[in-house]
A protein has these predicted regions:
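Generic detection of short hydrophobic beta-strand segments and adjacent strand-loop junctions
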Residues: 126-132, 154, 165-167
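C-terminal, active-site-flanking charged/polar segments
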Residues: 136-139, 148-150, 170-176
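Positively charged, low-complexity intrinsically disordered regions
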Residues: 73, 105-108, 144, 174, ...
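C-terminal beta-strand-rich structural cap/linker in extracellular carbohydrate-active enzymes
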Residues: 158-181
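Solvent-exposed beta-strand/loop surfaces of large extracellular or lumenal domains
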Residues: 143-164
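Short beta-strand/loop motifs in extracellular/secreted proteins, especially
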Residues: 126-128, 141-143, 175
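Active-site-proximal substrate-binding groove within the catalytic cores of carbohydrate-active enzymes
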Residues: 1-138
Length: 181
């Protein structure tokens, strides 16, 4: 996904998930949404086809209510955030670093809205401390940060030319932080 985002820059990318949807439990679908969020890649579900007892079986995700109703809450939660990331535009230089270092950070927005997508790929929940080059992003007066998935205010501390934001992240979970100017 990192390679796709780099090569496509700010163009949309939506992989076509072509699989046995009945073998994908809700936890697999949620994981797919979280992994896609950090790269602003819209999750999609193609028409699946697989061989069973010598016959091709076709599965259409969006024609089968047992799939799309099960995952509807994820679409409602993630798609508006993905659209905001897309509208802001991916920036190849994040001007941010994370502690612990295994937390992935991507920046969206060069002008108006500045968003940071975070992903904790570890097996344990953690508090990610993100240090942002506030001066280079014109965020030196920022005193407020909000998480878009959880809808919570998070600690935001100015430190000279930088800004420190602490965000709780579940294991294998993503979050997007909006900074106000």
């Amino acid at each position: 996904m990192a390679r796709a985002r780099t090569l496509l820059r700010n163009k949309p990318y939506s992989p076509l998930m072509n699989t046995r949807f009945d073998s994908m439990g809700p936890e697999v679908v949620e994981d797919y949404f979280h992994k896609s969020l950090v790269w602003d890649i819209f999750p999609s579900f193609f028409n699946g086809a697989y061989m069973q007892d010598g016959e091709w079986v076709r599965v259409h995700y969006f024609q089968d209510p047992k799939f799309y109703n099960r995952d509807r809450h994820l679409f409602r939660q993630f798609i508006p955030v993905l659209r905001r990331l897309f509208d802001a535009g991916w920036q190849p230089v994040t001007r941010a670093r994370s502690q612990p270092r295994q937390v992935r950070v991507e920046r969206y927005g060069a002008g108006g809205e500045v968003l940071f997508a975070l992903y904790n790929g570890s097996a344990s929940p953690l508090d990610a401390r993100i240090t942002i080059e506030a001066e280079s992003l014109d965020l030196t007066h920022t005193r407020e940060a909000t998480t878009l998935l959880a809808g919570a205010k998070v600690a935001c501390r100015p430190d000279g030319k930088s800004l420190e934001v602490t965000v709780p992240l579940g294991a294998g979970k993503a979050e997007v932080v909006q900074l106000s100017r």
